[in-house]
Amino acid sequence: MSSNKINKKSIARIAAVQAIYQNILQNNDDMDDIMQNVLSFYQNNNSITDLPENLKISLSISHFKMLVKLVFENIHKLDEIIDNHLTNDKDPAHMPILLRALLRVSICELLFCPTTPAKVVINEYTDIANDMLNEHEIGFVNSVLDKIAKEHTRLI
């Protein structure tokens, strides 16, 4: 039986979204505590249920830590960018927590990780959104990331 693996950076992105979600949900600003909680979950594959036997999950710890740290360092700028992309009838205070977490991490990677092509960032986080959010929110994530990529003149 062959072993399947998911890209380590893809898992790191999912884990970073989960860490930022935990930060918002628990109002916990202890970045090290949050990172340790999420890392311990991923490092113990036995705690991940519903996986095929031959699927191996591991994440790029360095990419995960970099994303979480960058979000914490730039959280106010990221929220300002997110809020500026809402339509007039949308109240930032009513944005679903998971959507805000995903946008914080994805916009952060788009703006502060220039070695990752914008097209890769947009595709990765749209795929993550597809697994976590509803259809309207998926389209919103794709649209916001595309606009931000164009605004910041990165090639997509």
Swiss-Prot record:
Gene3D superfamilies per UniProt: NusB-like (1.10.940.10)
Cysteine pairs bridged by disulfides in the record: none
Source species, domain of life: Bacteria
Pfam families: NusB
Single biological process term from Gene Ontology: DNA-templated transcription termination
Record-stated family: Belongs to the NusB family.
Function: Involved in transcription antitermination. Required for transcription of ribosomal RNA (rRNA) genes. Binds specifically to the boxA antiterminator sequence of the ribosomal RNA (rrn) operons.
Protein name: Transcription antitermination protein NusB
Species the sequence originates in: Rickettsia rickettsii (strain Sheila Smith)
Gene name of the encoded protein: nusB
